[in-house]
Design a protein with these regions (language model features):
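N-terminal presequence-like segments and adjacent domain-start helices
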Residues: 1-13
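Short amphipathic alpha-helix segments
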Residues: 13-20
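Short secondary-structure junctions
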Residues: 20-28, 70-75
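Solvent-exposed beta-strand sheet faces enriched in polar/charged residues
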Residues: 30-32, 42-44, 82-84
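A short interface-forming secondary-structure element
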Residues: 42-57
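C-terminal structural segments of small proteins and small subunits
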Residues: 61-86
Length: 86
């Protein structure tokens, strides 16, 4: 059973990474599953240069909003979001 959960978490992590890369094509993205729909994400992109942390986070959250919306949303929370320019 734990393997199924891990596989599902890995699939969602891949969806998160894909959604972020679609919105921020040059991004280096790392996603870590924390369990029960919780994730930690790190994103490095030139797009973030000269943007405030709030603006950087807004770009990422906009990209993953579909994964956080609805009763059966696979992403419950972003426990940690790190964004920075290279």
């Amino acid at each position: 059973m734990a393997l199924t959960s891990l596989g599902a978490a890995d699939g969602v992590a891949a969806q998160i990474e894909s959604a972020i890369r679609a919105a921020v094509p040059d991004a280096r993205v790392q996603v870590k599953a924390g369990g029960a729909g919780h994730y930690e994400v790190s994103v490095v992109s030139e797009v973030f240069r000269d943007k405030s942390m709030v603006q950087q986070h807004q770009l990422v959250y906009r990209a993953i909003t579909p994964l956080m919306t609805g009763a059966a949303a696979p992403v419950h929370a972003m426990d940690r979001l790190l964004t920075q320019a290279p």
